[in-house]
Amino acid sequence: MSDYIVVKCGGSMLDQLHDVFFDCIKKLQQKYKVVIVHGGGPEIDAKLKDCNINVEKKDGLRVTPKEVMDIVQMVLCGSTNKKLVMNLQKHNLRAVGCSGCDGKLLQVQPVSEEIGYVGEVRYVETALLKGLINMNYIPVIAPVGINDNEIYNINADTAAAGIAAALSAKELIFITDVDGVLHEGKLLKKTDEFEIVNLIEKGVITGGMIPKVQAALASLKMGVQKVSIVNGTKDFTEVTGECIGTTVTRGVSIA
């Protein structure tokens, strides 16, 4: 396990990031090497609507024919990425924005012809990330990747998980607008994949929290050791560098 931490910030959270979020990133930087991966779903949907293009999803993934990929690339690599980079720099954090196709950072395998230009991470060029970090920059990654010189859309959660796994990161942190998983009205601070599945089956975890914990479970399957779900509108870091929220680790199955 290394001293890298990957922070994944969904597109719906980008306009909700205030001083407290950037203060938390500064605190994390004191102990760890930080990489940020962002989404951009709401802005992509709005731009597609402006262009009279239907938003279509299949199994949670955006169906991405060529005309949609052009807009995804424009939003993720352009306005969304640069807005977050500028926000970090405004708070005196040195950041460099790049996409997964820059330097072949994220090399992908197409998911299926049916959903178009959508890929899954198969290789991460970690030397690029490490080089930026060694120059005291925070890499801010837009989740698009490359395959056979074509650009592909990547689900931001799986892009973050792929990067975290490739770096053998200490932790993957999902930034949300809730404190974490609640059980009987109390914050569930520590849990594992088996308990999460059990809580979903019992109906304890419902609604918008389900995709969040499913993303955490998928990350664990990709080799990430620890995933935390935190509230990015509050201080989510302890003095020790530990996260305040719900931390999910891999369970140990007993035969």
Swiss-Prot record:
Entry binding sites for substrate: G40, G41, R62, N153
Residues making up the signal peptide according to the UniProt record: none
Localisation: Cytoplasm
GO biological process: arginine biosynthetic process via ornithine; L-arginine biosynthetic process
Main location group: cytoplasm
Pfam family, one: AA_kinase
Descriptive protein name: Acetylglutamate kinase
Source species: Bacillus cereus (strain ATCC 10987 / NRS 248)
Taxonomic lineage of the native organism: Bacteria, Bacillati, Bacillota, Bacilli, Bacillales
Gene that this polypeptide is encoded by: argB
